Structures are given as C-alpha cells and as structure tokens.
A protein has these predicted regions:
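Class I S-adenosyl-L-methionine-dependent methyltransferase catalytic core
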Residues: 1-62, 77-86, 104-115, 125, ...
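N-terminal, Lys/Arg- and Ser/Thr-rich interaction peptides
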Residues: 87-92
Length: 341
C-alpha cells in the first residue's frame, strides 16, 4: 500500500478534495481515505503508476503537488530529522535531489530553511548529491496542523494553462463566466472522464464545455441567446474540443431520456440574465426535471446557484450527494450542489 498526499491550493477547503475523489472514482483508481489536514489530503492506494499520475496531474485544478509519502512526524525539527533518518532513499541511486519545505499558512514556529537544511544533511551524509537548480527529484516536507508530511513529489500541477484560459483571454468573451479552474474542478466532481457525454443546458460561452472537452469528453450545450451560442462555437473551435450546440430552452430539451453521463451547469442567477418568459424559480424546477430525465441512471449533476435548489432537485428525483458554498463577494455566495440520479 502507498500513501499519497495531495498538497492543495488554499482557495476553498472542500472543493479541492471533492475533485480529487471525483477523478480517482472516474478513473477507477482504488483508494481509501487516510486523513485530511489543512490543505493536505492523504489517501492510501495499492499503487499509482506513471500513467495514472499523469492523468491526475493533467486533471486536478486545485492541487499543487502530489507526493508519495515516505515519512510522517510531529512538526518539530528533532522529530522531522529522526523521521528523515528512517526513510529509505535507496531509489535515489545516483539521481540528484532538492528538499523543499512548505508551511501551510505559516502557522508553525520552525523555519522552512531549517527543515530543508536538516533533511538535506541526512541525504548528504548518506552520499547523495543535491542539485538546487535542476534536480532529478524534489522532496517535499509539508507542515500542516502540527504534522510534517515528507516524500518525493511524483507530480506538480501546472496552473498556467488555467490562467491562459481565463475568460478575457478567450476569443469570445461575455460577462458572467466561471473561472476555468472552478469549471474544471466541477467537471472533476461530476466524474467526467475521457469519452463521457457531458451536458451543460445553460452553456453560455462554453466555459464548462471547454474544460470537459479538454479531458476528452463529448460535450453538448444549450442556450437561448443566439449571440452567446455563436461565441461558444468560436471558443469551442479554438480549443478543438468535441461539441454540439443547440439553441433551446433548458426547461424543455429535445434530447432523449438517459442520454448523457454527466451534467455540469451554471444557470442564470436571475439578475441581468435572460430567462425567457417565466420566473427563475419555474425555470429551475422545469430544467431540474429535464436534467433528471436526460441523465443516465447513476449519472451526476453538479449545479452552481445562488439560491438553494435541494428541494426542487429532490422533487425531480435527484439524491443529494454534496453541497459546497463559496463566498464570491459580499453579496454573492455560490452554492455548488452535487446531485446523483
Ligand atoms: C451564468 S450564464 C452561463 C455561463 C457559462 N457557464 C459560460 O461559460 O459562459 C447562464 C446562461 O444561461 C442562459 N439561459 C438563460 N435562460 C435560459 C434558458 N431558459 N435555457 C437555456 N439557457 C438559458 C443565458 O443565456 C446564459 O448564457
């Protein structure tokens, strides 16, 4: 059994762990939950090969590093060094290394430099060679909740691609779009995988479809604004994803029953959005029934809203799987409702 630690980005507490679980489940990677520290999520697994590590690294939006845990100790220098002394570094062979320490929210009193120097000395004394510029292996010591988690980094997540896909950088921009990092995390929570059929019934400029399409899903989007749909086509073509767009109302979709694997959507909040001849409440109730109808059994819907939708969703037939809230600004807290059919 191998312990794997995910060093999480700090933006929200629960969404990063939910997306990890979503990816592990969608990729059929066997695992059991080990523990959760602040910004660190640890699982136990029979083993992750390089291919699966690459999949995790390419899909996770809110993880920074993935670490194979070699040692765990209380977060004081003496215990950290004696933990490092017990670690088997023999797989380093003649490879060079660097040791990096990260204190979560700077809570601990020990300095990162002392941890790096202390563990580095253990390796140096055993004859291993450090390379501070271009090391073959990075060891990471993460100090969180009075615990130090130590081991080699098996993957680091490059978030620059998410930056490049920010709404303003896309060929077509229209206000009210989710950031690609969050869109990708929601796609992961929905357990989308390569080959899945993913629907966004309120697709707007196609932000969610782009993220699902980039992991190899076939995407389907509906909207009732022609100019926005034309913009979605421009964006989806730009990223060369597999898509179909429909000019149709989310409250009555020309789709057959059980035909999509996952739904991820960000319906209008009812402020400036176009809703088409009825109240937002009626639209939400109608479209939740439609989403339930077109989703395959055991399929998952991840829905972003400002107001609670649980009762309508349960009336439509859905089972609540999770609920996350995310404060956007003083007058807007997003609700992310995860619903299973
Ligand atoms: C919050 S935006 C979605 C933004 C989208 N995630 C994106 O990447 O651009 C909500 C979208 O719902 C659309 N909409 C409003 N009423 C609708 C309806 N009855 N059926 C389908 N789409 C509708 C709006 O035109 C708008 O594009």
């Amino acid at each position: 059994m191998t312990l794997i630690a995910f060093e999480l980005s700090g933006e929200t507490p629960e969404i990063p762990t939910a997306e990890i679980v979503g990816v592990l489940e969608s990729e059929n990677i066997p695992f059991s939950f080990k523990c959760q520290l602040e910004q660190v999520f640890i699982i136990e697994t029979p083993g992750i090969d390089a291919g699966l590590t690459d999949i995790l690294a390419s899909r996770l939006a809110m993880t920074r590093h993935i670490i194979e845990v070699s040692g765990v100790s209380p977060a004081n220098l003496t215990d950290i060094i004696s933990m490092a002394e017990k670690v088997d570094f023999s797989n380093l062979n003649s490879l060079t290394y660097i040791v990096r320490a990260k204190k979560i929210k700077r809570k601990s009193h020990i300095s990162s430099e002392d941890i790096e120097r202390g563990i580095g000395k253990v390796l140096y004394d055993r004859g291993y060679r450090a390379d501070l510029v271009n090391p073959c292996i990075q060891y990471r010591a993460i100090v969180s909740d009075n615990t130090c988690i130590f081991g080699p980094v098996i993957a680091s997540i490059d978030s620059s691609a998410f930056e490049r896909r920010k709404p303003h950088n896309k060929p077509f921009f229209y206000p009210g779009v989710l950031m690609p990092k969050l869109a990708q995390a929601l796609v992961n929570i929905a357990r989308v995988k390569e080959g899945s059929v993913v629907l966004d019934p309120y697709c707007g400029t196609g932000g969610i479809m782009v993220e699902a399409g980039l992991i190899g899903a076939s995407t389907l989007g509906c909207d009732v604004q022609r100019k926005v749909l034309i913009g979605a086509k421009i964006n989806l073509d730009f990223y060369s994803v597999n898509y179909s767009l429909m000019f149709q109302d989310a409250g009555s979709m020309a789709l057959r029953n059980n035909c999509v694997d996952c739904i991820v959507t960000d319906p209008p909040y009812g402020r400036s959005a176009l809703i088409q001849a009825r109240s937002l409440d009626t639209l939400m109730q109608d479209s939740l029934c439609e989403m339930y109808r077109v989703l395959r059994p055991k399929g998952r819907l991840v829905l972003v809203s400002e107001r609670p939708v649980e009762t309508w969703a349960q009336n439509a037939g859905f089972r609540m799987a999770d609920l996350f809230t995310q404060r956007v600004h003083r007058s807007l807290t997003r609700r992310i409702t995860v619903l299973d059919k």
